[in-house]
């Protein structure tokens, strides 16, 4: 019996007690929904397999003492199929012990779940166990990473790549249609600074400083070897196309009042660099994401909002709703009407659009586009965007939507890359930062994705490079992957020994170690549902680590495949000791049951790792 089935049973009993007049003043409408009646795993196994606090939840509403209300609950539970014992403990806890067959039923449930149909989206051989449809019918637009196209993806963006894709997988496993979207900021001042930086690098590489050209990187510009690389690529591409950048620069250069060069190339050459370099960065970012196993459904270009008139249209929509006013020569969004701390300029007094104007148009587009309009627009933003939440939620409300429902904003905290307890700066190409490609080159995609997804994105996080590169149980991804590989090795040994679980009697899974593994397997569906509802995919990773720990302990305590004297795993050369080891061998029927349990663990680990975008290895 699964925890979900127990919760449903408890809910049914609550309604039956109301009908029978055994629940005091409690009425049906005061009974919480099933998902609020979750059972818990007792820390002390002497207290049973599962515990419920239903009596304490409802005692006040029933006008009864918790223990008095717990007694009829316990009596009804004791009559249910699959339950061996029920006890009322403490102030009103109900401790439930399942019979061995009922507890072991989860093994059949896991292995009988159908294979997923969209196999091309999965890394591992996954099945439907744990997946549900409670978010079915919803289209969720999940925008993440969205780093400016002015350099490689840094470690903060890498965290969002790992967390965002894991979140998308978790939401899809709960029935939602998820649109993974990357917002490509190819408009605005940061692109101008990028182009200026490239022009300066080009001028320096071509020794144009003596001619008065600006060769120093602008104080607000971008630095790093990648700037020099891209500048050289732009020059080579331009020359291949018959464009003379030096001639353009001379055309732009101009002279000051003394007849000397102004020292900074202007619009023509800068535009040439912009239009060639931005697509180059776009291609590089796309490749980095693909190599990191993140496949976006939509790459949305900010420039298109202006080119297609969507910014003007969105402002007109807000104007029609009475939320736009003019003041001091500028156009303002009256966001204070909707909870913001101050009103926001959207068109400056010089006629230029403020950055927020594009955000307004972008949200409106997400909600009303022809293909896959979003029921919920989820934004995953960095810690430096915390002050942006108020205006975004105000804009959502101004469009008649519900903040927190139609728009959700998740803020991620900082990541520090450490080695031997000290911060690491390992990128020669991008200057004083760590990039996605740097991290992957050191620890690999699996370790990078798992480590970044296993921590709550609301908290600062330190990555230990030495730990992630190690093959020890202290390395979380190794620990979980090794559990899967170990289970595969059990299968290989069982095949050699001629053991099959066909027709296995799962009631023989009756030891304490067996029970711990069974309970862990049963919790996977609720973990997956909670991870989706809370928008916290790290809960899947933490569950996998607990399952792996339970499995490794079980493996060391309960033998699955019988040992023979010639087994390489036989310990030592002492024949008496070997005989003692062999005496621990399970009888064939119990070995078959344990093999089936082994394969159920294997399946759940494969399912869970797939949700994190991490492979489940056959061998390690």
UniProtKB/Swiss-Prot annotation:
One GO BP: arginyl-tRNA aminoacylation
Superkingdom as given in the UniProt entry: Bacteria
Known catalytic reactions: tRNA(Arg) + L-arginine + ATP = L-arginyl-tRNA(Arg) + AMP + diphosphate
Pfam families, A to Z: Arg_tRNA_synt_N, DALR_1, tRNA-synt_1d
A GO cellular component entry from the record: cytoplasm
Keywords for this protein: Aminoacyl-tRNA synthetase, ATP-binding, Cytoplasm, Ligase, Nucleotide-binding, Protein biosynthesis
Segments forming a coiled coil: none
Subcellular location: Cytoplasm
Keyword Kinase in annotation: no
GO molecular function: arginine-tRNA ligase activity; ATP binding
EC number: 6.1.1.19
Chain location of the short sequence motif 'HIGH' region per the record: 147-157
Complex and partners: Monomer.
Protein name: Arginine--tRNA ligase
Lineage of origin: Bacteria, Bacillati, Actinomycetota, Actinomycetes, Bifidobacteriales
